[in-house]
Design a protein with these regions (language model features):
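Internal gly/pro-rich beta-alpha loop/helix module
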Residues: 140-141, 146-236
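Small-residue (G/A/S/T)-rich helix-start motifs and N-terminal tracts that mark the onset
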Residues: 1-88, 94, 98, 118, ...
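A conserved beta-strand/loop element that lines the FAD pocket in flavoprotein oxidoreductases
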Residues: 109-113, 177
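Conserved nucleotide-cofactor-binding alpha/beta core module
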Residues: 99-102, 106
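Intrinsically disordered, low-complexity terminal tails and inter-domain linkers enriched
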Residues: 112, 116-137, 435
């Protein structure tokens, strides 16, 4: 999301409560808020597409449709070719939506019923077309005002057909409040949803715009508060991670700093044939400033790990009991453990995890460390499951986790006192009694082998310096995502996990400069 947005994310219930408070104030009514919303959306449309000669609003039957009717009236008054295609006849509307439709029609806005057999089209039609374009001015931009934030059931006809027409129009799309068909709480698509280029959301930033499939469908998000007072900070349950939080979580270095102050990290992993995962985690810990990183791995993996000369390597015996005994000695002098990258799922791995648990050290549990049955992880630990691992921890399925990621995070927090990072597009970070966080940065290049190992190592490296599992997790998630963005801007596809690790210092420098 390139635009600067507030950090607070609100549920539908919280937004409705704010709206009720605003309407209780003297001199404010529903039509006033509707006019403010329409004006904000019109201003954003003209800013985003300054050459637009007009727009067509697809209006549904509720207040979201009312916003659309009002926007058409304001657009007409501004000299644009603004038109309405409605799925619910204006004479059947109620309240503010009815008043907005009446105002729009009185202003001379052309309004016709949506015809699913014709769709929207891009051919010149009765509304006229500029010479040589073949596209009617009113089709320069399509405005989605079909469904608002209250939808919780799958989209039905005729709205579903109107959404399909918008998505197949080939025109720029601006959505009002949320893209129609997207759950404003979970970010789940309810059968079918509008794919918007820009979404102007009203009063507050909704959680569903950043959760799940929300970012894919919302496009660039802009907020119009409509002069409604924000929710008190003590009532906020979700926030998006911003640069200020990250900056505060990165320990500053004095000019006379030495490596001993960077903390000692032990990576436990690198089973036979899986040296790369442990090495990536170790490199990431170094890249964020850890003072010393030791990789405890299988003897067969030691040479591959040692190819990174800055890493210390401790080969472990093949015998599980002997390996666990040796590992306990190493953990006794470590400040932080990162367990799981390339660890494996055999008795050797299980014995090492037992030693990790017995050490009591702050620990990042990742990858194979999350495969085995896990009792309640304590508050000094960080769990980093991807959706499949989260499903295993919860005894569910990946599809259920992805259908409602915030609910999955809450379920994990019910079971563990640890910080939990639910990885994926829009990674979530939570811990009991804290405001949960969502990362709105990142790029699909992060969906590559080894990037999770890099994230685990980065968390461990920051934790070794700060001693704060929460701050380390929040900062590492954001830095990891930002590193991916920076590389994607330069290289596009084909970015390797090792390159993500190498880009972490630049991401840190960037946030520390701002």
């Amino acid at each position: 999301m390139p635009m600067e947005l507030p950090v607070s994310l609100l549920s539908v219930a919280q937004v409705r409560a704010l709206e009720r408070r605003a309407l209780a104030a003297p001199g404010v009514d529903g039509l006033t808020l509707m006019r403010r919303a329409a004006q904000a959306a019109l201003s954003r449309l003209r800013e985003q597409w300054p050459g637009a000669r007009g727009f067509t609003v697809l209006c549904g039957g509720g207040n979201n449709g009312g916003d659309g009717w009002m926007m058409a009236a304001l657009g007409r008054a501004a000299g644009l070719d603004a038109r309405v295609s409605w799925t619910h006849p204006p004479q059947g509307l109620r309240g503010e939506a009815s008043a907005a439709a009446a105002e729009s029609l009185a202003a001379g806005v052309p309004a016709t019923p949506f015809d699913s057999s014709r769709g929207l089209g891009t051919e010149a039609g009765p509304c006229g077309a500029s010479a040589g374009t073949g596209v009617a001015p009113a089709l320069d931009v399509i405005v989605d005002a079909l469904l608002g934030i209250g939808i919780v059931e799958p989209v039905r006809a005729p709205i579903a057909a109107a959404i399909a027409a918008i998505n197949s129009s080939g025109r720029p799309v601006l959505a009002l409040d949320v893209p129609s068909g997207l759950c404003a709480d979970s970010g789940r698509v309810l059968g079918v949803a509008v794919r918007a280029d820009v979404t102007v959301t009203f009063i507050a930033l909704k959680t569903g715009l950043l959760f799940g499939e929300g970012p894919e469908y919302a496009g660039c998000v802009a907020l119009a508060t409509l002069e409604v007072a924000p929710l008190p900070s003590e009532e906020v349950v979700w926030q998006r991670i911003d640069a200020a939080q990250v900056r505060a979580a990165i320990p500053l270095r004095r000019r006379d700093a030495h490596k001993g102050q960077g903390g000692r990290v032990c990576i436990v992993g690198g089973g036979e044939g899986m040296a790369g995962a442990a090495r990536l985690a170790g490199e990431a810990a170094l890249r964020v400033g850890a003072g010393r990183v030791t990789v405890a791995c299988a003897a067969a993996s030691a040479a591959a790990v040692a190819a990174r000369p800055e890493l210390m390597v401790q080969p472990l015996p093949l015998d599980p009991i002997a390996a666990a005994t040796r590992l306990a000695e190493l953990l006794a002098v470590a400040d932080v453990i990162v367990a799981g990258p390339g660890l494996g799922r055999d008795p050797w791995a299980l014995a090492l995890l037992a030693a990790v648990r017995e050490s009591g050290r702050p620990t990042v549990l990742d990858a194979d460390a999350l495969f085995f049955p896990l009792t309640e992880a304590p508050a000094n630990c960080v769990l980093t499951p991807h959706p499949g691992e989260a499903a295993r921890l919860l005894g569910g399925t990946t599809s259920l986790v992805q259908a409602d990621r915030p609910a999955a995070l809450r379920a994990l927090l019910d079971r563990h006192a640890a910080v939990v990072v639910l990885k994926g597009a829009g990674s979530l970070v939570g811990q009991r009694s804290r405001v949960s966080q969502v990362c709105d940065r990142g790029h699909p290049v992060l969906a590559a082998p080894g990037t999770g190992d890099v994230l685990a190592g980065a968390i461990g490296g920051l934790l070794a310096q700060s001693g704060d599992p929460w701050g380390a997790a929040v900062a590492a998630v954001w830095l990891h995502a930002r590193a991916g963005e920076r590389l994607a801007n330069d290289a596009g596809r084909g970015v390797l996990a090792g390159e993500i690790a190498a880009a972490l210092p630049a991401a840190m420098a960037e946030v520390l400069r701002t």
